Amino acid sequence: MLTRIVLFAITNLAVLILASIVMSLLGVNPTQMSGLLVMALILGFGGSLISLLMSKAIAKHTTGAYVIEQPRNPSQRWLLDTVRRQAEIVGIGMPEVAIYEGPEINAFATGADRNNALVAVSTGLLQNMSQDEAEAVLGHEIAHVANGDMVTMALLQGVLNTFVIVLARVVGGFIDSLLSGNRGSGRGVAYYGIVLVLELLFGLFATIITMWFSRRREFRADEGGAYLAGRNKMIAALERLGINHGQSTLPTQVQAFGIYGGIGEGLRKLFLSHPPLSERIAALRMARE
């Protein structure tokens, strides 16, 4: 967590400097509300939308996943056939299907377009899950694609980013004015230091909101997996994950869209993208009754 906070601080400092340069070149005054909103919208949505558009390429690069063009064995043929069948049921285009090296049981889906997505599974999943369990996991990922979760998460992140940028600067300006005793003075080093601290603080709250929404999204994807593969298969798949549990080794760029997001206790649970497996299994069983 400390490493992430340090990296977040460095990134925000770089963004502050870059934003000031860009706004100066464009003739936009970021200290005025209109200029602040322009800057916040550009920075807030720019990063999340670029990440969304590049999500497939980023996922392939960070995981080393290779796309199955022509199946080399029955397992790969089964993967393609299952994904194709499930995609047809929910009415989306056939996603690219990929495999990445990893001992953990996991899979993920990503892509900016529900008709041009990517579904990838780990070698650990293929080695440790039955076909019934793997079918449910694939259904879970196809449900993410069909529900448009990648786009929704990007838009939510953009809104929260914009909120953090605006609020940090408004509150930062107020605090700086109180400390300096001069509400009309220009912004100095202290102001940017205050803004950086506030962005860290508000950014943590924004992350909690994003992860809460992500956990709600997982329940819906589980329901989608139950619809596509069968409720018992989806429950069995989650139980298998519980037996072979551990910390997720997926890169952070795609971790939110994996079938499994790791475990956590106490406050750390607020920052998890996935609910506890026990809660997901209980939700599926309650829906069946």
Curated annotation (Swiss-Prot):
CDD domains to which the protein is assigned, alphabetical: M48B_HtpX_like
Residues that hold Zn(2+) according to the record: 140, 144, 218
Topological relation to the membrane, as annotated: Multi-pass membrane protein
Transmembrane intervals: 5-25, 33-53, 155-175, 193-213
One Pfam family named in its UniProt record: Peptidase_M48
Localization per record: Cell inner membrane
Record flagged with keyword Aminoacyl-tRNA synthetase: no
Enzyme Commission code(s) on record: 3.4.24.-
Listed InterPro entries: HtpX_protease (IPR050083), Pept_M48_protease_HtpX (IPR022919), Peptidase_M48 (IPR001915)
Cofactor: Zn(2+)
Top-level EC class: hydrolase
Protein family per UniProt: Belongs to the peptidase M48B family.
Name of the protein in question: Protease HtpX
Naturally occurring in which organism (per UniProt): Xylella fastidiosa (strain M12)
